[in-house]
């Protein structure tokens, strides 16, 4: 059976995910035009102020980790989630209020809040697993509805796919349609304990690949250094799309004293009774 306590390795991996998310978002708020003017007057200035706040919120816990166990920790990460949600809502408005735009950002909004409640001891492993599964499932379903073209296939999806795979637009649409349905299936199966160990690696690998594609797709296409740097930070804040499924895997597998080097050992592992 899974132990109820959440150990340091889990907190560390979740903390890394939050840090990547907040830093990536913070830099993009400062360097890119995120179209805040759709919602706010003086939107660009408001956006840059939010970027500065996000970077400060990311740095504070690094300077003084004891902040996380105090009421200030709640303020730090709830504020980070709120600022990120503002950006998500701006994207939602810019996308014509398509529901998948909100849903696909579940990890971005939910992970900072989840992290602080883990640090405060408000969650046990079982609750944490369920919350992480909800966030991963919603994120992949949001991406999937875009990929299958339920309303539209975003132009950036097509550009990323054609540039990364060196295929034409028609082939990219077909590829995205297939992958979209695979995403939906896996987003449902993640809640079935007996099946989860077999599909979690798809979510891990695909989460990392889609993040890396934000940079890789433009390695040979962009002549603008500033644009390419922005794409690097687009990748950085999306790395939790792979890290959070990896965290689910590391919590639910046996043995519980997980180390990365154990992946490469050939010893057979008996599945936890949770999966029986």
Where are the model-predicted features located?
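Extended, low-polarity transmembrane helix blocks
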Residues: 1-152, 170, 174-178, 192-276
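Cytosolic, membrane-interface loops and tails of multi-pass inner-membrane proteins
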Residues: 37-39, 156-166
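Conformational-control "hinges and anchors"
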Residues: 187
